């Protein structure tokens, strides 16, 4: 009999838009682990402006609680990550995702905002979805109608290489 792996929910929140994010979250839910996303990355010098990466546990009700947090609908996303994956490993992956190539041009990617996902999700090819999700199984964000949206890792797509080249046509409009 196969055992089902536990999912951990990882919240990435833009602390420029929500400076008191950690206190707002800890008042509503338990934080298992908190990581400053820019710490140890090429953007280490911007730690005071860094998004936070928070493991908010393995219970799916955190998705509903998240929807009730003020301003989090526009300034955060939640990744679903198999508990076999280490938080620091995931952090390194997300740090790499901050700098991508679009049409051979280096770009800073704010993948941790709903605006990014609202603009791109329906137009992403499977390879870009796999690149953007990396080891995560899914991502959740809030659309403009305040409904939670979810994008799952595409079936039958292998793990992307570490060359973060985004090729969906939507990105060509950005460069």
Question: What label would you give each PLM region?
Answer:
Residues 1-108, 112-175:
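Non-transmembrane, aqueous-exposed alpha-helical and coiled segments at domain scale
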């Amino acid at each position: 009999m196969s055992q089902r792996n536990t999912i951990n929910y990882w919240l990435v929140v833009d602390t420029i838009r929500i400076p008191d994010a950690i206190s707002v979250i800890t008042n509503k839910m338990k934080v298992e682990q908190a990581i400053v996303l820019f710490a140890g990355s090429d953007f280490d010098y911007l730690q005071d402006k860094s998004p936070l990466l928070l493991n908010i546990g393995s219970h799916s009700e955190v998705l509903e609680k998240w929807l009730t947090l003020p301003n989090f609908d526009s300034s955060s996303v939640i990744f679903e990550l198999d508990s076999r994956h280490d938080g620091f490993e995931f952090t390194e992956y997300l740090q790499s995702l901050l700098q991508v190539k679009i049409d051979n041009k280096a770009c800073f990617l704010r993948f941790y905002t709903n605006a990014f996902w609202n603009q791109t999700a329906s137009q992403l090819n499977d390879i870009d979805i796999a690149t953007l999700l990396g080891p995560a199984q899914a991502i959740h964000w809030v659309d403009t109608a305040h409904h939670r949206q979810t994008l799952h890792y595409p079936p039958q797509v292998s793990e992307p290489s570490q060359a973060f080249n985004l090729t969906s046509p939507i990105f060509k409009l950005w460069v």
